[in-house]
Amino acid sequence: MSNYSVTNIGPLDSWRDHFGGFVPATTRTGRRVVDHELDGDVIGISATAYEPGEQAGYWHSHSEIDEVYLFLEGEGQMGLDDEVIDVHPGTVVQVGTGVMRTWRCKPDSPTQLRWLCIRAGVIPLPAIPDDAVPITDIPMPW
């Protein structure tokens, strides 16, 4: 057998139908942890779709994993430490270790905000990114 695996996450307009996450507290409609369906262990990927006005509702940071967010559709914002940036189709954001992050789909977005998050570290990634530190005592930046 060759060293590859394949899955199909469907067209963009079907992403909202999936219900998933890493742990029960962050499991939600519109999230799919794609790497749980693949055989690799050093790169992770998730596909997410938020409705207009929907937000993560929490911040998080990583101590050993970098993330790259590739926004495909919709209008949104990312909170990155003490900054807020606008994101839209074609925006690519690399977030290094130690940076707090959160995101939302703008209330006036004409479509769902859809993006891929690619995670990688210098060590094999666990199925649940156990280096994530939820930060619940800081309000959303919007």
Indicate residue ranges for each PLM-predicted region.
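A short, N-terminal "cap"/entry segment at the start of jelly-roll beta-barrel domains
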Residues: 1-43, 128-142
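Conserved short histidine dyad/triad with adjacent acidic residue
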Residues: 29-33, 46-63
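Short, charged/polar surface micro-motifs in flexible loops or helix N-caps
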Residues: 40-43, 51-55, 75, 121
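Conserved hydrophobic/aromatic beta-strand scaffold that supports enzyme active sites
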Residues: 45-49, 68, 92-94, 102, ...
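Short beta-strand His + acidic residue motifs that chelate non-heme Fe in jelly-roll/DSBH
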Residues: 58, 78-79, 95, 101-108
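Glycine- and acidic-residue-biased ligand/ion/polar-headgroup-sensing regions
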Residues: 64-66, 70-76
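Short acidic-glycine-tyrosine-enriched beta hairpin
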Residues: 82-97
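Double-stranded beta-helix
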Residues: 102-142
